[in-house]
């Protein structure tokens, strides 16, 4: 466990890191980034917690991370099978008029969040899987590694 200053700064920075990870995930179909990159940014928040508070404090979150990883995988597969009537992975929400289904205006990068069809939703599914996977790795490294018996 670190000093009071490190723990206080971690409490301030932790939600900002999660929000920035969500931003990278959400804008993945418009800018460089996406589910994996945003998930890695958000999972780095777990490493920040590990350094500031120690491994025992994170040990209780292994089950939540496992559930989050399962949900991300199932959400991705469900979105992939939405277009099975036409083509596997077909962007069935594009230009449908609903959520994430606005028609894409002409131009190289319109910059509209709702113009991606199923791609932003798949980015979120991948992001959840990466957050949970990398977060689990960080927690397990903290619990089982790092002992120096010299």
Summary of predicted features, one role per range:
Residues 29-43:
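Short, non-helical or kinked segments that cap or interrupt transmembrane helices
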Residues 1-20, 24-27, 49-150:
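Flexible extramembrane loops and terminal tails that flank transmembrane helices
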Residues 41-51:
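Gly/Ser/Thr-rich active-site loops/lids in small-molecule metabolic enzymes
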């Amino acid at each position: 466990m670190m000093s009071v200053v490190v723990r206080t700064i971690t409490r301030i920075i932790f939600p900002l890191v999660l929000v920035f990870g969500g931003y990278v995930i959400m804008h993945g179909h418009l800018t460089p980034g996406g589910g994996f990159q945003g998930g890695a940014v958000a999972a780095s928040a777990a490493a920040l917690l590990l350094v500031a508070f120690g491994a025992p404090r994170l040990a209780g979150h292994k089950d939540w991370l496992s559930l989050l990883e399962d949900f991300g995988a199932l959400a991705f597969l469900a979105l992939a099978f939405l277009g099975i009537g036409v083509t596997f992975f077909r962007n069935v929400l594009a230009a449908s008029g609903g959520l994430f289904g606005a028609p894409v205006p002409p131009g190289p990068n319109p910059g509209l969040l709702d113009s991606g069809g199923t791609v932003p939703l798949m980015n979120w599914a991948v992001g959840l899987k990466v957050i949970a996977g990398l977060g689990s790795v960080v927690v397990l490294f903290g619990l089982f590694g790092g002992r120096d018996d010299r």
